[in-house]
Amino acid sequence: MSNWRHKLWRKLSSFQRASYSTTSSRNNKLKLDDLRKLRPMILKRIENRAKDYPVKEIVPVAEEILIARKNLISNIAALLKVFPVLTCKFCSEVFVGKEGHLIETCRSYIRRGNNRLHEWVPGSINDILVPVESYHLHNISQGVIRHQERFDYDRVPAILELCCQAGAIHPEEILQYSEIHDNPQISEEDIRSLPAGDLKYVGANALMAWEKVRAGVKKLLLVYPSKVCKRCKEVHVGPSGHKARLCGVFKYESWRGTHYWEKAGVNDLVPEKMVWHRRPQDPVVLVDEGRSYYGHAPAIVSLCSHTGAIVPVKYACKMKPQGLSFSFTNPVPNLET
């Protein structure tokens, strides 16, 4: 009896697979025919949509973003003259302080093992404000960038490209604007001579500018479409992503080819670089045994909190300002061993 049921089940399953494959192929053919007919209408609609941009009501928002971004870069560059920032030599870990922590979270680029101690080197402003670049489009209705055309277009900061499409920057002046405002010239002697009250004021201004930039980018993304690759986090500011085959270049990445585009968010254009945050009740050097006690914070927030600036309440759940600290009796291990 069981053999008869087995044969009947095989016949039914084979019939179901055959009917399903025939139906799917027929549906795919109908979809391709429909797309060929709709292609001229879609292209015409894209061209007509470009006439509605830039939206005049959104231009002041883009201008406020540029002003806040300029203040943010200058204030962070000034704070880095006083407060040291360290970055790991083998991974992207960042720490705000004179001495790096001893938390074993290094997943190095080279094959030296996971969950090891970090090897700290001096950091820069790019470790605090993570640079995110995208291709600069001549206009919003231009064709998709092909792989062989990837060197014909300039790479600019994604925020500037978003503000350029919003009408705050002229397309031909965006490269010059980036060179002037992204490299502020600040004297180290003038910053070190500032009293503690002025440093607190600089930190508060940096936090305020950071929040303004993120809030403004969130508003612009509601009007101007942007894409991000799900796999490699490549950002493209425009209605459709480019076709430069820059995704999956490593051997362990099996997809190797075009990007997998999805809608971009604020964290894709203005990423929060999360770091371990040392609180006043914590030891001088954070150890691996107390990692469950310590808090996290965006690198900018951690840097500005060292100046005494008031941190927004929304970061309190991650920073654990009133949380318990880990107490240990063993000496700190030597890094040289």
From Swiss-Prot:
GO terms for cellular component: mitochondrion. Residues 1-20 form a transit peptide. InterPro entries: APO_dom. It holds the Pfam family APO_RNA-bind. Residues 87-172, 228-313 form the APO domain. Keywords: Mitochondrion, Repeat, Transit peptide. Its main location: mitochondrion. The keyword Transit peptide applies. GO terms for molecular function: RNA binding. It is found in: Mitochondrion. The keyword Transit peptide applies. Belongs to the APO family. May be involved in the stable assembly of several 4Fe-4S cluster-containing complexes of mitochondria. The APO motifs may provide ligands for 4Fe-4S centers. This is APO protein 4, mitochondrial.
